[in-house]
């Protein structure tokens, strides 16, 4: 179980200024097919966040997973009571970085439907990509500060 993560969530979630908490799912367990453990870990984190009225975002590091693993991880998060599923932290090493591709966002949206929100994060660096994700109905995006002027077309 994510005992330390639960303790950290409890430490920060009690502050009124905290509205959401991010947690990284154990992608090693996801890759190994240990979905019951993944669900239990996320549920413990969701329970801790919800105890204080905070939303929980679960990050999968989709660049380290197959499409099928992402689909199953989405179900783990939904079953555990997560509020968001999120593509990546932006700090994963050892894998090619693709981040919030339209393809992986579509997969996540297909799996969670209206039961969970989707946040795309990582590699959103062009206005076209940004607008495409908006057109797809993504709930939220994380855009690196260097990319903000580009995606918002502020460099005119």
For each of these PLM feature ranges, what is it?
Residues 31-34, 61-70, 145:
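Active-site glycine- and acidic-residue-rich loops that bind
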